């Protein structure tokens, strides 16, 4: 007799085969799969809310650099979907699994029955329905492909059964579970830039007198910090960064010209205003990184490096766009020319940076009580371990920490909410699950913390030692 396994076992083995070692969920969902996951060594983190679970998965994915999984039953799907907004904006490969009543129960006023596709469509790269057992293996595999390729992002699978139990309890032939190891990390299947475009951009770099690199989220997603530093140093190009790429260069690096855009340092915006060539690296050129599209000046030559060709030149017509992986393209550009010196331009940039630091130092050293946020950021800068991960909420938390927290060690990393207040604390728990060996610090305020304060119990129960 042929050996059979449940759909729950297939789901558990498929997740493990793709490198998943944590799931974040709200009960009740895929209970058979959860039992099988325990046997396979997967930590099952039961949260206090669906949004908390999705934020934990998001934080985990960003730090672990591989897909993460969150789950909820049918009635919790709307809350889970709301929590994917930050993963979508942050290009984080979170795979959301929900249950839904079987087809025979739909459109008949069944208990807790609601179409889920409209809830997830605008927040995911793909939302698929697993109606039949035959679809399960293929759609699970496709979910990892969708989440990790191109511009990474969340994916949703709606699994038949109020708690996914119809598929979870179905029987399958026991055998090797389909998986694709290349989709266990992100970004998967990196693409280099076209040689003709590399030559064209190299010509612009050589001709420029005052170039600047604007490092954005794609640099962090692509793990391109080292490649960008080598590129900037070879051609003597200062670097400004969005909050999402704050970790690109250490604070004291002579080419670090600060945080640009709306939540910014004046010096960084001054550099972009003065530049004659602006290279957006890993950027979709959004409002925040351009200070509502007022940076750079009209007519300035723009180069845009981005993984999605549809985004190239969307907001600036004077753009030479190159699609592909930002790390690979920076590596190609770094060997395209001989080293270039720009002493006069770098001296001008250094003066902008020096003037800004002098202007904020009285606040960073203030003895006022209660302590000012600027002083808090200075104290935190000085005591952060060399390998610390800082996870910040949005709003003033990211304005203060993003601009006034100085990261002086290459191993230090900074991640912030893309816009959902309350994301910081659950995301920091997910980050700590991904790297329990590293110190994780959550920078948030009372309002942000109160959104998901109950997850303190989750942290205590699982010994997730986030600060």
Name each model feature, range by range.
Residues 97, 106-112, 274, 313-315, ...:
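Thiamine diphosphate
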Residues 11-12, 16-19, 24-30, 35-36, ...:
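Active-site diphosphate/adenylate-binding microenvironment
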Residues 97-139, 245-348:
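Glycine-rich, acidic loop regions that bind phosphate or pyrophosphate groups
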Residues 1-2, 134, 180-184, 199, ...:
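Phosphate/pyrophosphate-binding active-site segments
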Residues 9-20, 59-65, 88, 146-151, ...:
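Glycine-rich phosphate/diphosphate-binding loops that line cofactor/substrate pockets in enzymes
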Residues 62, 217-303, 408-438, 452-454:
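Glycine-rich, anion-gripping cofactor-binding loops and their flanking helix/strand elements
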Residues 21-25, 43-45, 63-101, 214-217, ...:
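A short, small-residue-rich loop immediately preceding and capping a beta-strand
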Residues 142, 146-207:
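Conformationally flexible catalytic loops at phosphate/diphosphate-handling active centers
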């Amino acid at each position: 007799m042929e050996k059979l396994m449940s759909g729950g076992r297939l789901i558990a083995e498929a997740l493990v085969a793709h490198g998943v070692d944590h799931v974040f969920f709200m009960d009740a969902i895929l209970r058979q799969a959860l039992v099988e996951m325990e046997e396979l060594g997967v930590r099952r983190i039961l949260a206090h809310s669906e949004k908390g679970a999705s934020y934990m998965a998001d934080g985990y994915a960003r730090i672990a650099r591989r897909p993460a999984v969150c789950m909820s039953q049918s009635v919790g799907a709307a809350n889970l979907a709301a929590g994917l907004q930050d993963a979508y904006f942050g290009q984080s490969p979170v795979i959301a699994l929900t249950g839904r009543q079987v087809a025979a129960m739909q459109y008949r006023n069944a208990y807790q029955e609601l179409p889920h596709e409209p809830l997830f469509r605008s927040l995911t790269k793909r939302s698929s329905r697993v109606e039949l057992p035959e679809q399960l293996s293929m759609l699970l595999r496709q979910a990892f492909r969708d989440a990790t390729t191109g511009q990474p992002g969340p994916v949703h699978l709606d699994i038949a059964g109020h708690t996914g139990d119809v598929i979870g309890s179905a029987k399958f032939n026991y055998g090797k579970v389909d998986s694709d190891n290349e989709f266990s990390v992100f970004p998967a299947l990196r693409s280099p830039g076209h040689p003709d475009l590399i030559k064209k951009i190299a010509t612009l770099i050589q001709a420029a007198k005052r170039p600047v690199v604007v490092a954005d989220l794609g640099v962090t997603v692509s793990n391109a910090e080292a490649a960008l530093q080598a590129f900037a140093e070879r051609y003597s190009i200062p670097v400004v960064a969005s909050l999402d790429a704050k970790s690109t260069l250490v604070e004291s690096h002579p080419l670090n010209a600060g945080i640009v855009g709306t939540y910014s340092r004046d010096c960084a915006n001054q550099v972009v205003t003065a530049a004659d060539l602006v290279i957006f690296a890993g950027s979709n050129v959004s409002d925040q990184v351009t200070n509502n599209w007022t940076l750079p000046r009209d007519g300035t030559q723009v180069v845009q490096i981005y993984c999605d060709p549809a985004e190239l030149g969307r907001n600036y017509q004077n753009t030479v766009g190159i699609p592909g992986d930002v790390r690979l393209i920076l590596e190609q550009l770094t060997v395209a020319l001989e080293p270039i010196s720009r002493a006069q331009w770098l001296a001008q940039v250094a003066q902008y940076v020096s003037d800004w630091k002098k202007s904020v130092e009285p606040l960073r050293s203030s003895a006022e009580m209660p302590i000012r946020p600027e002083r808090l950021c200075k104290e935190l800068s000085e005591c952060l371990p060399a390998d610390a991960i800082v996870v910040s909420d949005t709003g003033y938390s990211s304005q203060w920490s993003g601009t006034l927290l100085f990261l002086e060690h290459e191993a230090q990393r900074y991640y912030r909410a893309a816009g959902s207040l309350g994301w910081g604390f659950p995301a920091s728990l997910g980050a700590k699950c991904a790297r329990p060996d590293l110190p994780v610090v959550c920078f948030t305020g009372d309002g942000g913390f109160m959104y998901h304060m109950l997850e303190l119990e989750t942290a205590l129960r699982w010994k997730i030692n986030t600060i």
